[in-house]
C-alpha cells in the first residue's frame, strides 16, 4: 500500500449553519528518535450537553510525566473556548500571549483557539504540574448555554527524543476546522520502514459523549477504536488516551494505533476529516510513522 488514508468522520446535528475556520496544515516535522505525549485539562465542570449549569472554571492543571531517557525537544500550548477570544493567559508563573490565533464561526456563534511555543518553559520546568489560569473571557451566555456549545480547555503537545526509540517521523499539524468541512492533508516523500509504533493523535474541542450519531475514525476504510475509551461509534467523547480519563468534558486528547492500516514502503499519506452531527473542532493532529529520514527537514 503506497498511500495512507485516514478518515475521521463525525455526524453534525444541523445542516443549517455557517462555518468559518482555518485549514489544518503542517506546523513542524521531526525526523529521528522522536515520539510525543500530550497533557491538558478541561475547564468545564460538566458536559455542556447534559446540564443547564453553564459555569466554567478559569483554570485547571495537569501533570507531565516522562521517563529519564526522554528529553524534551519541543512543547506547544493550545487553548480554546467559546466566544471571541481570550489571548492572555498564565501557564504556571508565565504570562502567555499567542504566537498564532485561530477562529471559527458556527451559526453566528464565535469560537477561538490560541497557540504558543512553550518549549523553553517546559524544558526549564520539566516533569511535574502545569496549571493554566486566567482563561476568564469565555462566553457562557444563553446563546451558547442553551445550545450546549459553551466550553474551554487547554493542552500541551510535547515532542521528546529518546535514544531507545526507532527512527520515526513525527508530524505536527494545526489549525481550527470543524465538521462538516472536509479536511485533506497530503503527506508526500514519506518512508515507512516498519509499521511498529505507528499512530495518530489529535486534540479536539467541544465533542460530547452523549452525542454519538455515526461518529467514527477510519483509516483505509477500517474503523479504528480504542475501547473502552473510544468505541467505534463515539470517537469524540471527552477522553484522554494518555491518562485513561473519561471525564475530560468537551475536549479530547486521543491517540489511535494504526499499525494494522499501513505497510512498509508507504511513500505518501492522505489524511481526511469529514462531517458529522456532534459539533467538533479539530485543533491539532500528530502522526508518528517509522521512517529512516535522518534529520528534521520538512517535506
Give the ranges of each region predicted by the language model.
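Disulfide-rich extracellular domains of secreted proteins
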Residues: 21-294
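Bacterial Sec-dependent N-terminal signal peptides
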Residues: 1-23
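Surface-exposed, proline-enriched loop/turn segments that connect beta strands in immunoglobulin-like
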Residues: 298-299
Amino acid at each position: 500500500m503506497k498511500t495512507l488514508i485516514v478518515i475521521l468522520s463525525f455526524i453534525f446535528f444541523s445542516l443549517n449553519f455557517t462555518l468559518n475556520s482555518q485549514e489544518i496544515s503542517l506546523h513542524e516535522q521531526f525526523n529521528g528518535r522522536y515520539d510525543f505525549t500530550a497533557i491538558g485539562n478541561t475547564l468545564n465542570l460538566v458536559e455542556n450537553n447534559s446540564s443547564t449549569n453553564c459555569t466554567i472554571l478559569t483554570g485547571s492543571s495537569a501533570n507531565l510525566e516522562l521517563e529519564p531517557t526522554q528529553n524534551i525537544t519541543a512543547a506547544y500550548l493550545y487553548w480554546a473556548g467559546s466566544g471571541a477570544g481570550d489571548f492572555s493567559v498564565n501557564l504556571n508563573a508565565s504570562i502567555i500571549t499567542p504566537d498564532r490565533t485561530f477562529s471559527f464561526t458556527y451559526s453566528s456563534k464565535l469560537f477561538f483557539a490560541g497557540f504558543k511555543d512553550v518549549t523553553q518553559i517546559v524544558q526549564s520546568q520539566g516533569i511535574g504540574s502545569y496549571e493554566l489560569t486566567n482563561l476568564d473571557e469565555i462566553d457562557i451566555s444563553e446563546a451558547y448555554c442553551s445550545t450546549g456549545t459553551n466550553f474551554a480547555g487547554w493542552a500541551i503537545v510535547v515532542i521528546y527524543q529518546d535514544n531507545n526509540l526507532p527512527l520515526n517521523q513525527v508530524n505536527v499539524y494545526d489549525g481550527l476546522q470543524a465538521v462538516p468541512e472536509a479536511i485533506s492533508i497530503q503527506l508526500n516523500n514519506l518512508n515507512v520502514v516498519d509499521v511498529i509504533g505507528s499512530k495518530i493523535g489529535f486534540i479536539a474541542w467541544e465533542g460530547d459523549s452523549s452525542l454519538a450519531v455515526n461518529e467514527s475514525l477510519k483509516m483505509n476504510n477500517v474503523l479504528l477504536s480504542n475501547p473502552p475509551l473510544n468505541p467505534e461509534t463515539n470517537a469524540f467523547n471527552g477522553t484522554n488516551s494518555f491518562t485513561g480519563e473519561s471525564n475530560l468534558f468537551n475536549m479530547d486528547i486521543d491517540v489511535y494505533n494504526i499499525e494494522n492500516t499501513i505497510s512498509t514502503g508507504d511513500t505518501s499519506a492522505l489524511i481526511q476529516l469529514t462531517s458529522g452531527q456532534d459539533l467538533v473542532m479539530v485543533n491539532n493532529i500528530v502522526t508518528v510513522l517509522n521512517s529512516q529520514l535522518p534529520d528534521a527537514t520538512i517535506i
